[in-house]
Amino acid sequence: MGSLKWIVSVSAMASLIFLGLVILSGWGLSGAYVPSLTDGFPATLYLEKYSSGGHLLRSLHYYSSSGLVFSGFIFLSFFYISGFTAKYRKTWILCVLLYLLIIGSAFSGYVLPMDQNAYWGTKVRLSIMETVPLVGPVIADFLRGGATFNSATLPRFFTLHGSVLATTICLCLFLLIQTKKSIFIQYLSDQRFNVTLLVSIMLYFVLINNFSAPLELPADPTDVEYNPRPEWYFLWLFQFGKYVEWAPWIQSGVLPLLGVGFLFGVPWLRNHAQKRRSVIVIAWCLIWLVLTGLAVIDDKGLHHNPNYSDGMALHAEKNFNRLCIDCHGAGGLGDGPESQAFDLPTPNFTASDFWINTDEQRMIIIVRDGKGIDMPDFGESLTYEQILALVIHIKKSFKPNYKE
């Protein structure tokens, strides 16, 4: 029993730390985020690439959310195995409610980056929600602000994620702390605990800063071949849905209802022996692992969705072939068919002298504004990010002895 208490305590403390980091990083991100279909992705990209500390905030928010889902699951599992749910009913109910709110917050925040996975993943989730008998279509339309994605969709999800659910989570957390106030005071008054906590958070910051939160290309509603995939903790439900396509309401309604009903009813259920409670948790973990594993295996045969940098590089190559190759040639020698036909003074990208007399910013300006009567401007047809990716592609492909 001593080891169980230790796991419950550690997972509870880890969950609180992750939750605190999620809330604080979320506040930081909300200061620069614009909840609109046109500005949602540019705001996210600005945070990731140009804002001071934006990369760290996004990584902190994303990975702390995943850590919170995992540590919260560990806490609830071992709290249940310990057999204290009947004795501490109020604590258990608050913990379950808090965990469900966290899952809901993860769902509502998924669409905010407005990249490909966010857009298509949310469309799939809402279509699944619509299969819930009676209330499903009403809830889905309310979240979208209509029957389809529109200008009201992102503001609604942003308000739900950053205000409604965040406030409710803070309220539940406050009530939970009040029920165990003496335990928190005991921990916080322990100097060794405080030092360990501070060092752990600092190491976590250093580690997280080396990883980027996922970001794909901007949402493209016309890309019907895109394969959205949920977060790792929803993969099992996604896979389960494949086996009940004949009755999707089982995935969207019956299964969640049974799961939530069981969690809230645990304190009033017959208190089985610890061994039986352990078997129930292990069985659920095995089901989760099998379904998640099957989902990962099925995904191996699907088209890989590139991240933002890789996707922009692919688009840059296509843009070069579409816009530049007729003049500059496939090898960047300036010997394209139009250059030869009209005797145009096209630069040779493979010559060292060209790169001595130019730089990245100058090339961006030329591509954007054009040069003379022969070089057209592409400022209206390409975004700044697309122009930058095109210039980088030219440097990587043709500059002699190029090094990043």
Identify the function of each model-found stretch:
Residues 1-240, 251-284, 288, 292-300:
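Membrane-embedded alpha-helical bundles that constitute the cytochrome b-like, heme-associated redox core
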Residues 148, 341-399:
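Extracytoplasmic electron-transfer domains, predominantly the class I c-type cytochrome c fold
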Residues 173-178, 260-269, 291, 373, ...:
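C-terminal capping alpha-helices of c-type cytochrome domains
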Residues 185, 337-341:
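Short cysteine/histidine-rich zinc-coordinating motifs and their immediately flanking basic loops
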Residues 244-247:
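Interfacial "cap-and-anchor" motif at the non-cytosolic start of specific transmembrane alpha-helices
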Residues 297-321:
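Electrostatic cytochrome c docking/interface patches
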Residues 316, 320-331, 375, 390-394:
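The canonical Cys-X-X-Cys-His
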Residues 332-336:
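Short glycine/serine- and acidic-residue-enriched loop/turn motifs that recur at repeat junctions
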